Amino acid sequence: DVVEHLKDLMKSMKEIHRVSRNNALVQIIVPYWHSSEAFYPDHKYFFNTDSMRFFTEKDRTYYSFPGYKMEKIVLIPSRLGWLIPPIPTPGFLFPNVLNLRHLFSYLLGQIIVKIDFRMRVIK
């Protein structure tokens, strides 16, 4: 729970990449954009499931930052969120939704409180 406080996320991710060994696992846990934790006054960034694509996808045309491979995205639910099962949703209907819990979070808020990104360093 540090990344959302950083002044320059791009520079910090480059530095993490620089000091890490090849194939190192980088785990970043941040508040989910639709939770109340995301809106603390000292937070500089908001994160959703697509936020780390800047650092993992080579086909971005407006900003290229190869060097990480996304291993896993874990949505950490609130107490209420645990009541909704993480059943997969059809990709053709909801291309940016990971599961039913994620969909309900868009609709109701406060279902997901944090996102856990796990990425491998590629050198």
List PLM regions with ranges.
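Short alpha-helix
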Residues: 44-67
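Conserved class I S-adenosyl-L-methionine
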Residues: 24-51
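Aromatic-acidic/polar surface patches that form glycan- and anion
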Residues: 5, 45, 108
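Conserved SAM-binding loop
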Residues: 1-34
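A C-terminal cap/extension of S-adenosyl-L-methionine-dependent methyltransferases
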Residues: 64-123
